[in-house]
UniProtKB/Swiss-Prot annotation:
Coiled coil: none annotated. Pfam families: AMP-binding, AMP-dom_DIP2-like. This is Putative fatty-acid--CoA ligase FadD21. Keywords: Fatty acid metabolism, Isopeptide bond, Ligase, Lipid metabolism, Ubl conjugation. GO terms for molecular function: adenylyltransferase activity; ligase activity. Its EC number is 6.2.1.-. The gene is fadD21.
Length: 578
């Protein structure tokens, strides 16, 4: 085990600063005002060892331990305890009672865990799910809160830990979930990379009294690293709550950010939009966001207009543009790949839409261009833009696949040697001078370099080909969202042997009567059709207006476009206009 592993640093912090606050969890499900519980470093370490002792009774080194627990301090103990026991932790969400959670079932089948860790509150739902006829034998269930977590912790250490600390199962927006094997070395390397960029003006170190604020789910890579791993690696206090707590009242997030000490957080694009729409002046009266060090914006496409609205909304509360840090990353690279330098505010550059659809990037005036955010020039990890067919680097201004190389890149996918070779074993042909040797990670994301800055246009597998031209669904969706405000899926479907554009749009109707509602739908249809034609030169074959929650998504909120196509083909969407 590396001296800088999560486990060794946890042990060190428990010894050097035993009574300092480590993790604070605010439970808003039991009380609307919130019930707060805090663990010190020594308490976290003790719980980790107690859980590890119990896990070790059912596991040998390298066995998988799946965590199916609600957000909370018990989840943290389960995750750390699994690794301390020499098992490979597998963080997941809790399956719903009476429902078939395909993702959880797929992961259980792939990981073949020897033990399940949960809590007494959801043990029934977990047991119901894992004991179904088609589910493989997955070992016993441990209820974390039923253990004596305040007693003496047993003294033991596993000498030879597995190479993988945990399996981060991908969202599966384009395929079945695959377990990315993340090592302690990956975690330490990626933490150093992101800290060097986010805090480059502070020599890669945040102020010692920094509080990391997060409501992101622990089973998602950004929530796991931000909420559990980064506080241990950096020695920072973490203030946590659940995704539901944020969705119910986004102002809770803002109050945690304004706790008086320097704070750091992260959120996907929709969270910034929701905070703008659902936060009233009364919710945040007297709030001061001046101590916010930064908020990472990632996990999904970052919309420039959303960030502008967020900054404008909270500017009276001392929030500044340079506090938002649009970032690019993926689970296969542990989490982080690129963002602009510390102190830089988000930069939006406009490019000719027609050129983008042919694979070129030409800057233009804002009135006629497609807005894209800059992610700076990545230095660590190393990034190249590559033609995915020839494996030759693309010149600046040419769209290609983003390839990544660095100690943060994972070893591969669990039990998937063919996919591992394809995704993690890419080799450059005729690499440019100064390019490191060895294999590269194919991200599946398309981007380009322009004036020494990287821009991202979308996923290769999501690209729409309509009338023989390439279009990026995120661009079309962004155009529509400026009108509707809700989730949008742009898909292409075959009609009479030709691919046609279909947009699925989630709407919450505001009309008081059926007649007013239909009039509202007609106005939206006309506005959306005109905007897509004007901005992208496309005709829409069908506008599918549906209630909120209709568009299938991954656990991290990414649109499952292939599933959208299938639902559309089978006429499974419930249309608001009949």
């Amino acid at each position: 085990m590396s001296d800088s592993s999560v486990l060794s640093l946890l042990r060190e912090r428990a010894g050097l600063q035993p009574d300092d606050a480590a993790f604070t969890y605010i439970d808003y499900e039991q009380d609307w005002a919130g019930i707060t519980e805090t663990l010190t470093w020594s308490e976290v370490f003790r719980r980790t060892r107690i859980v590890a002792h119990e896990v070790r009774r059912h596991c040998t080194t390298g066995d998988r331990a799946v965590i199916l627990a609600p957000q909370g301090l018990a989840y943290i103990a389960a995750f750390l305890g699994s690794m301390q026991a020499g098992a490979i932790a597998v963080p997941l969400s809790v399956p719903q009672i009476g429902s078939h959670d395909e993702r959880v079932s797929a992961v259980l089948a792939d990981a073949s865990p020897s033990v399940i860790l949960t809590t007494s509150a959801v043990a029934e739902a977990v047991a119901e799910h894992i004991h179904r006829p088609n589910t493989n034998n997955v070992g016993p269930i441990i209820e974390i809160d039923s253990l004596d977590l305040t007693g003496n912790s047993p003294s033991f250490r596993v000498k030879d830990l597995p190479s993988a600390a945990y399996l981060q199962y991908t969202s599966g927006s384009t395929r079945a979930p695959a377990g990315v094997m993340i090592s302690h070395r990956n975690l330490q390397a990626n933490f150093q990379q992101l800290m060097s960029n986010y805090f480059g003006d502070r020599n890669g170190v945040a102020p010692p009294d920094t509080t990391i604020v997060s409501w992101l789910p622990f089973y998602h890579d950004m929530g796991l690293v931000l909420g559990i791993i980064a506080p241990i690696l950096g020695g920072y206090r973490s203030e946590l709550t659940s995704p539901l707590a944020f969705l119910q009242r986004p102002a809770r997030w803002l109050h945690s950010l304004a706790n008086g000490s320097p704070s750091w957080s992260a959120a996907p694009n929709f969270a910034f939009e929701l905070a703008v729409r659902k936060t009233t002046d009364a919710d945040i009266e007297g709030l001061d966001l001046g101590n916010v060090l930064g908020i990472t914006s990632g996990a999904e496409r970052v919309h420039p207009n959303t960030l502008s609205r967020f900054c404008n909304r909270f500017a009276p509360y001392n929030f500044r543009e340079d506090m938002i840090r649009p970032s690019y990353g993926l689970a296969e690279a542990t989490l982080y790949v690129a963002s602009r330098n510390s102190g830089d505010k988000p930069e939006v550059v406009y490019f000719e839409p027609d050129k983008l659809s042919t694979g070129s990037a030409n800057r233009c005036e804002p009135k006629t261009g497609t807005p894209l955010l800059s992610y700076g020039m990545p230095t660590s990890p190393t990034v190249r833009i590559v033609d995915p067919d020839t494996c030759i680097e693309c010149p600046a201004g040419t769209i290609g696949e983003i390839w990544v190389k660095g100690d943060n890149v994972a070893e591969g996918y669990w039990n998937k040697p063919d996919e591992t070779r394809h995704t993690f074993g890419a080799m450059l042909v005729h690499p440019s001078a100064g390019t490191p040797d060895g294999s590269w990670l194919r991200t599946g994301d398309l981007g380009f370099l322009s004036e020494d800055e990287m821009f991202i246009v979308g996923r290769m597998k999501d690209m729409l080909i309509v009338y023989g031209r390439n279009h990026y669904p995120e661009d079309i969706e962004s155009t529509v969202q400026e009108i509707t405000g809700g989730r949008v899926a742009a898909i292409s479907v075959p009609v009479d042997h030709t691919e046609k554009l279909v947009t699925v749009i989630e709407l919450k109707l505001l009309g008081d009567s059926a007649g007013e509602a239909m009039d509202e739908l007609d106005v939206i249809k006309n506005n959306v059709t005109a905007a897509i034609s004007r901005s992208h030169g496309l005709n829409v074959a069908d506008l599918v207006l549906v209630p909120p929650g209709s568009i299938p998504t991954t656990t991290s909120g990414k649109i499952r476009r292939a599933a959208c196509v299938e639902q559309y083909r089978l006429q499974q969407f419930t249309r608001l206009d009949g």
